């Protein structure tokens, strides 16, 4: 299933490339690729910037690596390529934040090992604005689309609690215990890529390009 998903992602880019290539006088000046910070491995100590040389790793890392390799081929068509490595997108209208708010109705939630995993996130409004910023300023190359101030998963839970106006009681589950069911059903990569995601990703490059965040920290989200 994983290989099928990866192939579908890459094949869609190949199809788009061939369509544009057939148009000798195409007027496509820029392609903005929605990539992911999943290209970076989990780490308790490193801060990742765009210069990091990713190696073959877990499923999500491999998908993103192949995706970014394929998108660079559009340069051959004299098209400016902008790759945005998107972090965890936060919005009260959908995604993980909305799910956490819904879960908070139970007033009980589980975190892994105290919820200290680093979460490199971005508010959906900033993400939309960064796409616009990339077009207006003709950005080229790879940029991390993340907030300048990453948070822990526990802080994300606390934000959901604040937005739902309900106090939340967190229970910490040891990683060694939670990993067992994922290992038994053969989706260990999903556990490391999503459930136990822990990566500190730098926003310095997009900030230095002139972008000003509306939501530089979780405290701004209300």
Where are these regions (language model features)?
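Short, small-residue-biased leader/transition segments that mark boundaries at the very start
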Residues: 1-4
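Short-chain dehydrogenase/reductase
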Residues: 6-10, 46-68, 90, 117-121, ...
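Conserved Rossmann-fold NAD(P)-dependent oxidoreductase catalytic core, especially the SDR/UDP-sugar
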Residues: 13-57
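NAD(P)-dependent short-chain dehydrogenase/reductase
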Residues: 58-61, 65, 72-83, 87-118, ...
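Alpha-helical substrate-binding/gating segment
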Residues: 101-109, 116-150, 158
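C-terminal amphipathic/interface module of NAD(P)-dependent oxidoreductases
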Residues: 136, 169, 190-222
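Mid/C-terminal beta-alpha module of Rossmann-like enzyme folds, strongest
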Residues: 137-187
